[in-house]
């Protein structure tokens, strides 16, 4: 299996090249190691390649990771579903938080979502396992995509390729001062 599951240094980020641009997810191994290993291994295997963001709710979140594109599919590297890794130290405090989509407790598979604003009502219900490191503008554009009455994008947004990587990420693109605070947030980590 990949180094992400063999005890070596885990992958630290996953880069998603989509039909509307590229974004990079920083993985929170310290808080959600099994969830991070799941995403990294799925990305490394090409599982996400060619899938779509099947659910977009403006001013809330964008959701993908289902190979069926229906919102009902997807499996983990662990064979089916796996348990939540919810910690009270991580909160959905703003745009750019990456969490597992689920259909109830301990039903994580391959689907994930990225928040477009603070969503505290999700705290304790969804495993937070990362944040958008770069490309939040791409995610925000995704969030503005017109959708039908079932929150499906009218024009598909496709993941062309998702690949994990280790070590220092590539430099962030230069941004103007106005863009630096444009809704991007870190998951708040509090001492327990």
Predicted regions and their residues:
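Cyclophilin-like peptidyl-prolyl cis-trans isomerases
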Residues: 1-192
